[in-house]
Regions:
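Short pre-active-site segment immediately N-terminal to the catalytic Zn-binding motif
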Residues: 2-19
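Conserved catalytic/binding loops enriched for acidic/polar residues
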Residues: 5, 36-378
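Active-site and adjacent substrate-binding regions of carbohydrate-active enzymes
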Residues: 11, 30, 38-39
Length: 378
């Protein structure tokens, strides 16, 4: 769909999967944001796999578009279908159990249906989160590796940006469509940053009952967390010049390019330097020692990346200077502010690690980073 208007065939398929999703809600199915984590990333480039399984095992996930597919991946499905999880959930909820005379008689049979698929990721349920703690249960993400999936997604965005003017061109029209689509590219890029950064200090949640083995909550692997921060440093904190196209920006605005990059960088930076995330990293180290990606190590890696010019002696461009100021602003915030309370309305739905900041290690770690930075600068 290299343009603003979709063909009727594509629009029909879009309506079909959105309608199926909403019908799922009407029969009692909640969002299943953990569904898409079941598929290996590269399987979503396979025509045979995606034609059979779609983009996720459940239509109730937000796995709307296959951003992993690359040019040349012929026949790859780009949209979700009703999947094995959906059929299983509907069967569990609605299939008559004729041999049961009472609800208590039904329970062991229903439990057996669940246990039959307990080790199959296609049948996993992951709740919708307002404040991501479990990075495997996010909206709009695909596949089992956020770094790999996001690299494919960014590769596609890099192909889109140089063509936006041509794809939106129409004699007699303004550049409004160009502005809208460029904004959508930025939004999608920001989603990828969120998908990856949520792994830092992340904790997986896999529902279990007493008769199932293993932990319900597991911290994200140390090396993967480190890799996620490295990805953010390389793809976002190093100025993403591919998003800066003067031939495009001079058609949609008189200013805004520099600040737009600042906003996107600061948003992800603040997401990483979140009180709750930092609190989980402290707890992970307390529980697992050297196996954890400690808050001190993460903060050191972050500082060295954002202030890399102090070591390389490279020039600091305006975008990087803005990022460095945002870093200082955020550290000031961490030293002087406390965690914002959750409103009573959102308390039921919000995932948030509560931290008593003044009595935690957070400010001690931040203070040490500021001292190290001061020494490096001087």
């Amino acid at each position: 769909a290299q343009g603003v208007a979709f063909k009727d065939e594509i629009m029909g398929r879009l309506i079909r999967f959105v309608s199926a999703h909403e019908v799922g809600h009407t029969i009692g199915l909640p969002h299943n944001m953990g569904s898409s984590f079941a598929y290996p990333v590269d399987s979503l480039r396979s025509a045979s796999f995606t034609q059979k399984y779609g983009t996720a095992p459940s239509i109730m996930d937000y796995a709307r578009f296959n951003y992993i597919a690359q040019p040349g991946d012929e026949g790859v499905a780009l949209m979700p279908n009703i999947g094995p999880y959906d059929k299983h959930a509907v069967r569990w909820g609605y299939r008559p159990i004729l041999e049961a005379n009472t609800p208590d008689d039904e329970k062991p049979i229903l439990d057996a249906w669940i246990l039959k698929h307990q080790n199959d990721p296609m049948y996993r349920f992951g709740k919708q989160q307002f404040g991501v703690i479990d990075p495997s249960s996010q909206t709009e993400d695909l596949g089992d590796n956020a770094i790999k999936a996001s690299k494919y997604g960014i590769a596609n965005l890099k192909r889109i940006v140089p063509n936006l003017i041509e794809w939106t061109a129409e004699d007699g029209k303004t550049y409004e469509d160009l502005e809208i689509l460029y904004g959508q590219v930025l939004s999608q890029f920001n989603r990828y940053m969120g998908h990856v950064s949520s792994n830092i200090g992340g904790v997986y949640e896999y529902y279990k009952t007493y008769d199932q083995e293993g932990a319900v909550y597991t911290h994200v692997d140390r090396e993967y967390q480190k890799a996620c921060l490295k990805f953010i440093q390389e793809e976002l904190f190093k100025t993403p010049y591919w998003l800066i196209d003067t031939n495009l920006s001079n058609k949609i605005e008189f200013d805004g390019t520099v600040d737009r990059i600042r906003v996107n960088q600061a948003r992800t930076l603040n997401n990483i330097l979140d009180f709750g995330r930092m609190g989980r990293m402290i707890e992970n180290e307390a529980l697992h020692g050297n196996k954890a990606y400690s808050l001190t190590q993460m903060m050191t890696d972050l500082r060295r990346g954002i202030w890399s010019e102090l070591y390389s002696q490279e020039n600091i461009d305006p975008y990087r200077r803005n990022l460095q100021r945002a870093y200082l602003d955020r550290l000031e915030y961490l030293m002087t502010e406390s965690q914002e309370p959750v409103s009573p309305l959102m308390r039921r739905y919000s995932n948030q690690t509560r931290v008593q900041v003044s009595q935690s290690d957070i400010r001690a770690v931040v203070r040490a980073q500021l001292r190290n930075l001061k020494q490096t600068i001087s």
